């Protein structure tokens, strides 16, 4: 190294030290009790130096650098380093104590901070120089070699123990004295001499005089050296590990200029003990010199571990190299994860490393295993490297480490998870791109990846040109595999797909040893060409499959058709049409195969391929027909005007694929029938028949192509007419019931182009016509008797099949069951519960918010996983008891569950979905969830968006028509179940799932409310009530608050006693101990406690008023008191709402007839409202309504005074005259004159009844009542309990009262306790798409009528909250 380079190295080291000082060593330095720069004592004296500082301290002194001695004596000297008491500013203190000092103790004494590497005088260290004067031994240096190099001057280290001596430097030929200029003396370092003065010296020695005695130092042998050191290395290069007791050998080698001299110095732990030995070596090479120093320590111990530093110095350059020596007490193996137990890679990676953190000595043997199988090849114990990662690389890798000599063994396992980008397998195989129109097609995507793709997304786009690109790795793939660069892809749904979608399902399937995701898109009707793609994604990639879904009317895109379709007859015109899809094929050609060329010389048949068809066939001239506008196919027609036997043979149509350029062929064999003259296989024979018998004559013909067979009677052409039948291509003549005039000569004539053949026979008729008439009478009589017995047997059979009490089906609403023979509680015990059909696991039911709660029950919104037998999650409502419910309440809820099961499903009734009855949890009844809440609140919210005649979407109109047509179809089919409409509506929606899963066409909160909607709601409620009435179930609380609105404008009847407290509901008025919905109750229910289907019809009329007033409360402003009840009984009614059309007004008026028998049945209401809904004509109704509205204030409001006896139908009228509708009062186009009670006339037209009084025209007498919590109503008026008692006693017979329903009468003794049943209804609100619930319930008291369903005393009924 050049001198300039050495200078730069020194500057760099100085800057590094200053940088370290600036960065962290600006601190308070330690202080010594000896403040002098040098300190002089005499030999044999003791030396004590104390050092204090802010950090732990350590001492070094001559011959003991960096040796830590704490509180003990050295083996050679009597020096001691121990702790002393510090101060508050410098809490750490160390004292160095030397007893019996000698001259060799002369030198520099350093105190420094122990744990700070940088030793900077005045910053992290403090020192002083101590002279131990020995007048007998003033020189203390040892014999040494002095390397003389090219420096200007150098120090001769003649160290002295006495400062201030006069020193002379002598060589073999000269002596030098310090002159203060070129030759300098320093008591601490020796004498500095110019280098040129020493080049001729062989040795050097210092001389001094003390007293009268001369003293000489030890000799310095002078050695002239080279100037430059090249490199230094310490072997082993890495850290060295040993066990206690082993031998340490370190080799420090320097490469230097030829004939250079180097001084080695080792620095290592335990240097003071001088246990190490180092041996210098020198090897001269031709161009340089290698100098080494080998350090050896036998029987290493824990004290020998640490850094070992080798320093080489030639006087100009100083090289250092270090290594770390680790000494272990005993053999060990330690291994742990470096990046965790699970590592991930992706298939296709070039390599992956499985690293471990390993520490072991001695180095153990090792082996890598994969899934318990040894991994071959050379590997590293610190990391296993895998190249070209594939899915097969995944597994559990284990590193086994062992040291047999020490009996050590360790294992560690790592799991490698190889993520595989998803891949769709159908892309590997060719798939059809042509699909027949109106066919059912299934598109499949089977994907595999790691992790497994959770779902498959389907998209479609219209069949329009789209730019494509080819994937680089699949350049030769056909065009259909290129991915379109289009942005107009749409997600496939079952509603807005261009082709009707039957189903879209995805599932996991075990295929070829792997779990694969399979998705099938089933297209119900292929109508329109489109492009489909399926997309699968996981966390490391995605894959897509493009499907060109081209729809054509040609099967497989290529076909041959012939006219005529059967084998042609000689002489006929034949046309062979080759039809090919333009999108797929081009270059249509006709060939006729040459029979002579289809065999080789030996007569063996040749292999016929479409590619070489031209070698065996003759091309034919054909006509390419012009395609119709919009057609996507081409037709090449081969016409043969008059086919002959020689035209028989194979005809081939050849087409060429547009993309692959491959040729495809279809072959048609044309068979020609030779024309021959017709012949009869049997001649006609003469016949003798009786009058009224049947006659049959046959004219069987043999021979091909018989174009004409004609029959003659008495030379007159015989044609097919009543009683005469010609069949089997006119080969058979039949005459039913022969008459005398049918006698005569019959001729059969058969002709074709080759000629004609005839056959004739005579027919004679005998007997009289009267005999035939008698036979007719006998036949008719026999038929009548047979029909009579058939009807009788049918009635007997139906009576035997009448369901027993154990088979009673009833509603789950606020129903009354007939306890005439068996009490309700016993009936419920007879009902069974099929757990295999209805039990639903609780763990798949996630309960949500409480929709409503009452005194002992609550209704909760919940998510049910798989309740529709699929994998979807559906929102349901769950009824359950509150904590602390009694056993009777539990039995009541269980009884209601059984009733719900036996009543069955209906589209317009909230239906049961399942139940949780197992004893490991609460009893829960699961019913449908209706997202739009009750109808009353919905109508109120939609008032602002009411648009009577807004145009409905085609989908909504289709649903409306389906409802009406389904109801009429069920009516026409005797015995059809009410489930039919429910199922048919769901199928119309394109789904076969249960009612809760009907997909809604649009959000009802966003669409306007129309007059058509109001009629539709009314029709559906009537339909649901018809269903309940057919089950002999009475609702008793039919109101808009108990009608729920679901998706797709479907309304459902409900009544939720479990979740309502009617004691807090203003619509219920207290009557004695019961609360009653008086505004909705019929007069016979208020006064006589009679509840029948006819009383439900009255409530339906009030419900109509609510609907057409958009959710208003009935009888607005009317006080609900005794006067109200009396006037209601006397015939006063509500005025119709302004939105009600004349037809709706008449329906209301009929429902509010005072005579229950005069009210229409629900089946009549269904037909009337269905015709009204189906007929349309809303603008005409509006004009009629406006015209009526102008005169409503003084004339008919649609609600006139109707006496309970205003309608008179005599027995004669009832027997003689068919029922007819008063079409002058009801619009015929809506009603079609369908009759129902209350608007019938027999024979003659009955004049209209007198005008009905309304509450608006005749205000009630003002009465002030103090409102209380017991009897408040929504109008703010109440009817006191005492008034009810008075009103009831006033109209009750003295001994008993009569409860009449249609055709029934029941006398109940006075004082008979009223059976009570729980009553409940939901109160819901919806605003902004949310549903709010205010559910309450209570109790009512009522007797029941014969033939209808009534609960026994104490029976409790429950229904769903909001459903």
Swiss-Prot record:
GO biological process, one term: sprouting angiogenesis
Region (Disordered), start-end ranges: 1288-1330
SMART domains in UniProt: IG (SM00409), IGc2 (SM00408), TyrKc (SM00219)
Reaction(s) catalysed (UniProt annotation): L-tyrosyl-[protein] + ATP = O-phospho-L-tyrosyl-[protein] + ADP + H(+)
Listed name of the protein: Vascular endothelial growth factor receptor 3
Topology term for the membrane: Single-pass type I membrane protein
Key words of the record: Angiogenesis, ATP-binding, Cell membrane, Cytoplasm, Disulfide bond, Glycoprotein, Immunoglobulin domain, Kinase, Membrane, Nucleotide-binding, Nucleus, Phosphoprotein, Receptor, Repeat, Signal, Transferase, Transmembrane, Transmembrane helix, Tyrosine-protein kinase
Pfam family name, one: VEGFR-2_TMD
Consequence of gene loss (knockout): Embryonic lethality at about 13 dpc, due to failure of remodeling of the yolk sac capillary network and defects in remodeling and maturation of primary vascular networks.
Enzyme Commission numbers on file: 2.7.10.1
Species whose genome carries this gene: Mus musculus (Mouse)
